[in-house]
Swiss-Prot record:
Pfam families: Cystatin. Keywords: Disulfide bond, Fertilization, Glycoprotein, Metalloenzyme inhibitor, Metalloprotease inhibitor, Phosphoprotein, Protease inhibitor, Repeat, Secreted, Signal. It comes from Rattus norvegicus. The modification Phosphoserine is found at residue 316. One of its GO terms (molecular function) is cysteine-type endopeptidase inhibitor activity. Belongs to the fetuin family. Its main location: secreted. It is found in: Secreted. The lineage of its organism: Eukaryota, Metazoa, Chordata, Craniata, Vertebrata. This is Fetuin-B. Residues 362-378 have a biased composition (Basic and acidic residues). The gene is Fetub. One of its GO terms (cellular component) is extracellular region. Glycans are attached at residues 40, 139, 289, 292.
């Protein structure tokens, strides 16, 4: 009986081994987490510089941005695809218009009472062996320094004024008229005012910056500066209109100054091509059949948002402070990541895809972040 029972148990064990289904496969391991980097590391500062260079390059309007400090930096190393950096950058507006295409090293930040500052979030792809530098996405938010802060530091300094104010337009048109009268060989028309401040000197004074374009009209036409044409802006002018008491006292004497800087001619429309530094975009094959999870793009996705000055309410004690520079940048919300087709950067038959993760928050930031400021903002 015991032998029979042992025989039955052995038979059952053999059947279970033979017919047991294979063990379920292990779930795929999640993508490697983002690694925090020091905000003053040489690699991080170099990548931040490339990112801002690309952001400036694709703009068609406004002023170039310069780096004040790296606020946060993470990296995702991706085997043969190189690295994808996630950067949060504190930036300052310079006095160089984006159409000037000047080297960023030649563009300093504005004087403190004209300060415009903010933050950019950027993703930047680096593949050193393949000599690829690429900006897939960015977003920036900028604000001017508040009038209250300017007044507390320098009560008599110029302060910003509405660009559409009649006195601002008067300063722009009269200073441009002066420039045209002193340069009769070619006439220029006003495109738009880009900056304006006011100050009381010996009377009301206005200081303006504005874009100009070539005008088909002649010097004898008084409305030349307001005539429309399809030509692109060719330069940036700085003008001033200072009014001082005249004779009789009810009238003002006007003093007008102007200087204009002309842009170098561009062979291509700014921002119209692929900003990858090491690639000729006109020769790059572009795919348009990629699935939604891996869109094929050449120009970076992003924008620069200008917000009004932020005033601190008098009864703000005990309240949570408002986020000064709200910036969102998410190519995906999938915590496991999605893929981004960057095959056009590599010119190879097989597809090349980057893994893109949600933009990181403040958690697990490097203790070396934020980095040191280059210029203290008011």
């Amino acid at each position: 009986m015991g032998v029979l029972r042992l025989l039955v148990l052995c038979t059952l064990a053999a059947c279970c081994v033979a017919r047991s289904p294979p063990a379920p496969p292990l779930p795929n391991a999640p993508f490697a987490p983002l690694r925090p980097l020091g905000c003053n590391d040489s690699e991080v500062l170099a990548v931040a510089g490339f990112a801002l260079q690309n952001i400036n390059r694709v703009q068609k309007d406004g002023y170039m941005l310069t780096l004040n400090r790296v606020h946060d930096a993470r990296v995702h190393r991706q085997e043969d695809m190189g690295s994808l950096f996630y950067l949060m950058l504190d930036v300052l507006e310079t006095g160089c218009h984006v159409l000037s295409r000047k080297a960023l090293k030649d563009c300093g930040p504005r004087i403190f009472y004209e300060t415009v500052h903010g933050q950019c979030k950027a993703m930047f792809h680096v593949n050193k062996p393949r000599r690829v530098l690429y900006l897939p996405a960015y977003n920036c938010t900028l604000r001017p320094v508040s009038k209250r802060k300017i007044h507390s530091m320098c009560p008599d300094c110029p302060h910003p004024v509405d660009l559409s104010a009649p006195s601002v337009l008067e300063a722009a048109t009269e200073s441009l008229a002066k420039f045209n009268s002193e340069n009769p060989s070619k006439q220029y028309a006003l495109v738009k005012v880009t900056k304006a401040t006011t100050q009381w000197v010996v009377g009301p004074s206005y200081f303006v910056e504005y874009l100009i374009k070539e005008s088909p009209c002649t010097q004898s036409q008084d409305s030349c500066s307001l005539q429309a044409s399809d030509s692109e802006p060719v330069g940036l002018c700085q003008g001033s209109l200072i009014k001082s008491p005249g004779v009789p006292p009810q009238r003002f004497k006007k003093t007008v100054t102007v200087s204009c800087e002309f842009f170098e001619s561009q062979d291509q429309v700014p921002g119209g091509e692929n900003p990858a530094d090491t690639q000729d975009a006109k020769k790059l094959p572009q795919k348009n059949t990629a699935p939604t999870s891996s869109p094929s793009i050449t120009a970076p996705r992003g924008s620069i948002q200008h917000l009004p000055e932020q005033e601190e309410p008098e009864d703000s004690k005990g309240k949570s402070p408002e986020e000064p520079f709200p910036v969102q940048l998410d190519l995906t919300t999938n915590p496991q990541g999605d893929t981004l087709d960057v095959s056009f950067l590599y010119l190879e038959p097989e597809e090349k895809k980057l893994v893109v993760l949600p933009f990181p928050g403040k958690e697990q930031r490097s203790p070396e972040c934020p980095g040191p400021e280059k210029q203290r903002t008011p």
